């Protein structure tokens, strides 16, 4: 923690506050970010802090850790063969539940409205599908890597919510 344990703990306190208040850490501190989260690194931050502060710190953040996990797993109980995906959870054919990036909104991002409209106009998909894929990519922190593009080149081929990212699922298993 580089001798900055107090600073790290204050940052984790701020993230815990957001989780306890909203259920997740928003992509930013503006109301238009309330549809998407930050990637789930909170457990890793708490674990890093526990190297200095020991088990007591794990107990301090237990409720926030559980709440963030429940945010990412919301909808799991309602998944079935007719509805294999709800928000950030997807049930695969073998009944395993995995996670994906998602955004509750399906309209252009306020912070990049004109750009999103332009990308949607160039896409073969319906605009609301493109907007959700763009927003989900922003939630991932990989905005806008070619990993989300079907053709590997053009943002108009974005397909973020159709993919199950291994890194996201590893973070949630931590």
Where does each model-flagged region fall?
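Acidic, mature catalytic/reactive cores of soluble proteins
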Residues: 1-174
């Amino acid at each position: 923690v580089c001798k900055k344990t107090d600073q790290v703990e204050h940052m984790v306190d701020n993230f815990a506050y957001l989780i306890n208040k909203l259920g997740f850490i928003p992509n930013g501190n503006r109301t238009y970010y309330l549809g998407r989260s930050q990637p789930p690194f909170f457990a890793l931050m708490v674990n890093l802090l526990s190297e200095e502060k020991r088990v007591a710190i794990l107990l301090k953040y237990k409720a926030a850790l559980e709440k963030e996990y429940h945010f990412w797993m919301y909808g799991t109980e309602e998944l079935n063969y007719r509805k294999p995906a709800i928000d950030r959870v997807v049930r695969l054919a073998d009944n395993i539940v995995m996670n994906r990036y998602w955004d509750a909104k399906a309209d252009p991002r306020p912070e990049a409205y004109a750009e999103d409209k332009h990308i949607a106009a160039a896409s073969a998909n319906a605009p609301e599908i493109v907007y959700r894929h763009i927003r989900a990519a922003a939630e991932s922190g990989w905005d806008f890597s070619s990993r989300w593009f079907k053709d590997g080149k053009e943002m108009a081929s974005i397909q973020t919510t159709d993919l199950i990212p291994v890194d996201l699922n590893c973070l949630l298993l931590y």
